[in-house]
């Protein structure tokens, strides 16, 4: 049973105990992502440079009071990583032993950055290389544009990594402003699942946060009222490639849905997409046999900014025909419901729950 605890400092904690697991999963979520460029800090408007959230993620993992957190966790036999999305930055660890100690290291390390010119320049180099590699990727621009056009109404958002010029211009004051503004208990969530002692966990969290001196900053994100409709009907990107790629995006407004209903929708969408667009689906086989697509249809479903965003995409040399088929498929509800396949998916889902092989993060995400 998922339990929510909110501390006096505003920190939200979600606990999903499961003593049948040997592993404990810990995720620190900061509500600061690639889109958070327009904010009010102590009543004054500020523009945060694009790419700051991602840059800060790297810095916090590599330069803090403990040193390089991923190296330290690796020496302790603990899996660890971090990533930045449109609306969040996340740091997670998976451990079997010394849960409380590892939790303390994660929380203390992330909140004790070492920020100076040398550190920033050391972080900057690899991120510039990461950005250049992303620009060389065949479909980076088209994937990015399709995603943004479907969900975001924000003028200053460029990409999670930012432009090369943004990365090159990041200074100490930019990092310090972002860290002090967003890395605070009332803007963070801690998710813990698996095997752990609840009382010990809560005590560690309280002790760590009590020892941190947070800046007295009042921050207000500039709220964007997203339209229920897509922002742009079509985005065309010209790149020097031999093979075209089409990405068709849909969004479902789930802002006012209850957490449990979001979880159920996520589960049903997984079945729906796999059954209708998977490798063995009738539609995929038909498009491959007719040489309309190269390879197979790819699909995804993500929860972003209160919307479930569905993407159906494929490499194709007959883009207009592929687009017409997919749009007609949705518009005229030509969906296939295979009861036998649905029951098989349901049985597999139940087996995952019984054997505890389900993805704890995917289970919890719609609930928080």
Where are these regions (language model features)?
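Flexible, glycine/charged-enriched surface loops at secondary-structure junctions
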Residues: 216-223, 286, 294-300, 336-346
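Catalytic zinc-binding patch centered on the HExxH motif and its immediate surroundings
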Residues: 17, 22, 78-86, 299
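Second-shell loop/turn segments in exported
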Residues: 42-43, 59, 90-94, 114, ...
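Acidic/histidine-enriched segments that form metal/cofactor-coordinating
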Residues: 64-178, 294, 324-328, 337-368
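Helix N-cap motif at beta-to-alpha junctions
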Residues: 95-99, 194-199, 315-320
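PAPS/PAP-binding and catalytic site of the sulfotransferase fold
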Residues: 103-107, 190, 201-206, 322-330
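Short, flexible turn/loop "capping" segments at secondary-structure junctions
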Residues: 82-85, 158-159, 180-186, 239-242, ...
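His/Glu-rich zincin catalytic helix
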Residues: 1-68, 179-286
